[in-house]
Amino acid sequence: MFTGLVEDLGKVKNLTLSSKGAKLSVETKLEDVKLGDSVSVNGACLTVVDIKSSTLTFDVSPETLKRTNLGKLKTGDYVNLERALRVGERLGGHIVQGHVDFTAPVKSFNFLGEHYELVIEIPEEWSIYVVEKGSIALDGISLTVNYVKENKVFINIIPHTYKSTNLQFKKVGDLLNVETDILGKYVINYLNKLKKKEDIFKEFLKW
C-alpha cells in the first residue's frame, strides 16, 4: 500500500521488452530499499529484483505493460517513486494500492498564475468512480479532483507538486496512469451486489 506522496524522481536507465514482459532499471536516491521490496513506479506496484549501487531493477508483467504507461518509457525519462507504506507511518495522501486501472491522455495543462490546471479524459465506464473533491492517483501522485465535466477530469496542481514530480515533464497527449479511489470501488461494488439481490427478490415475489 502507498500514500501517493512521491519520494523521489527516478531516472530510467534501461527498459528491455520481451514476450514475458519487461525489465525496467531506474536510477534513484531512495535509501533503505531491499530485494523483494515493493515500490510504486508511476503508480504501479513493482517488486525490486536487483540492486546495483543506486539503480533498482524491476520485472514488469505483460498485464502491467498493458494497463500502464511503463512500456512507453525511454532512457532518460523520469518516473515517480514511492516506497511501500510501513506500519505506524502517517498516511499523508490517500490509500493507493499501486494497481493502475487505466491510462488517460492529458487534454490540457496550463499555469493559471498560482497553480496549474491539469485536464485528463477518462473512459466513460470509469467516470462513476471519479467524483468532485474526491481522491485520484495520477502516475502515483495523490491528487484531489476539482470537478468533472462529462468524461474530463479537472485537477489543480500546486507548484510544489509540479516541481517535485514528473508532471513538470508532461505535455498534451501524454498518457498518465490512473488509479481511482479504492473506497469508491468498494461502495459501487456493494451497491451493485445489493441491487442484484433486490432484483432477485422482486423476481421471487412474481412467483
Swiss-Prot record:
Binding site residues for 2,4-dihydroxypteridine 1: G4, L5, V6, S142, L143, T144, N156, I157, I158, P159, H160, T161
Intervals holding Lumazine-binding repeats: 1-94, 95-191
Keyword Repeat applies: yes
One of the GO biological process terms: riboflavin biosynthetic process
Transmembrane segments: none
Pathway: Cofactor biosynthesis; riboflavin biosynthesis; riboflavin from 2-hydroxy-3-oxobutyl phosphate and 5-amino-6-(D-ribitylamino)uracil: step 2/2
Enzyme Commission identifier(s): 2.5.1.9
Binding site for 2,4-dihydroxypteridine 2: C45, L46, T47, D59, V60, S61, P62, E63, T64, G98, H99, V100, K133
Gene3D superfamilies per the UniProt record, alphabetical: 2.40.30.20
Reactions performed catalytically: 2 6,7-dimethyl-8-(1-D-ribityl)lumazine + H(+) = 5-amino-6-(D-ribitylamino)uracil + riboflavin
Keyword field: Repeat, Riboflavin biosynthesis, Transferase
InterPro entries listed in its UniProt record: ATP_synth_asu-like_sf, Lumazine-bd, Lumazine-bd_dom, Riboflavin_synthase-like_b-brl
GO-annotated molecular function: riboflavin synthase activity
Enzyme class: transferase
Function: Catalyzes the dismutation of two molecules of 6,7-dimethyl-8-ribityllumazine, resulting in the formation of riboflavin and 5-amino-6-(D-ribitylamino)uracil.
Subunit structure: Homotrimer.
Protein's UniProt name: Riboflavin synthase
Species in which this protein is naturally found: Aquifex aeolicus (strain VF5)
Higher taxonomy: Bacteria, Pseudomonadati, Aquificota, Aquificia, Aquificales
Gene of this entry: ribE
